[in-house]
Design a protein with these regions (language model features):
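Active-site entrance/lid segments in N-terminal catalytic domains of soluble metabolic enzymes
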Residues: 1-167
């Protein structure tokens, strides 16, 4: 594939087209769209916000919270989020067939963002190339990205926000 006037870049150790699927919230981008972007040589971006999980028949697993306390239900939410995002990454990686790159998108202000991000990155080592993050000031994201050897692509709303994150 070629694009007039556009040259590939090296991202995460592989040559890709500098075409990035925009990160969207709440399960808006999944393994199908992200895997297709990567298979075409671009950078697919999976929403790691309430991502879908599937049962053995390929049906979406409903996220049902059965715990009695708010704290326990929050832990259920985190578990669903990690399981769903990991499943989406694995499926996208398979569709990509070794081409392009896969990023994940998280909303820093969602409940349990850091725990979810670390859980997903821990279980998808070698499959995720970068993390985009908006909805808040993800001060700790650069440290997390460094620890997991992935790129950090913050979504910033202003020059002031950029300066604060750059410190």
């Amino acid at each position: 594939m070629s694009f007039k006037g556009l040259k590939p870049i090296v991202y995460g150790g592989r040559e890709v087209w500098p075409l990035v699927e925009g990160g969207k919230g709440v399960a808006a981008t999944n393994h199908m769209s992200s895997g297709a972007w990567a298979a075409a040589g671009g950078i697919g971006t999976i929403s790691a916000v309430n991502a879908d999980s599937y049962d053995s028949e390929g049906k979406i697993v409903p996220q049902v919270y059965s715990a009695l306390t708010r704290k326990e239900r929050h832990q259920e939410l985190i578990r669903y989020a990690i399981d769903g995002a990991v499943e989406q990454v694995r499926r996208a990686h398979e569709i990509a067939g070794g081409k392009g790159a896969i990023n994940i998108n998280v909303l820093w202000e969602m409940g349990g963002a850091q725990e979810i991000l670390e859980g997903v990155l821990d279980l998808t080592r070698g499959m995720v190339t970068g993390v985009t993050c908006g909805a808040g000031m993800p001060y700790k994201l650069s440290e997390i990205a460094q620890r997991y050897n992935v790129h950090y692509l913050p979504i910033v709303s202003s020059a002031r926000a950029f300066r604060a994150l750059w410190k």
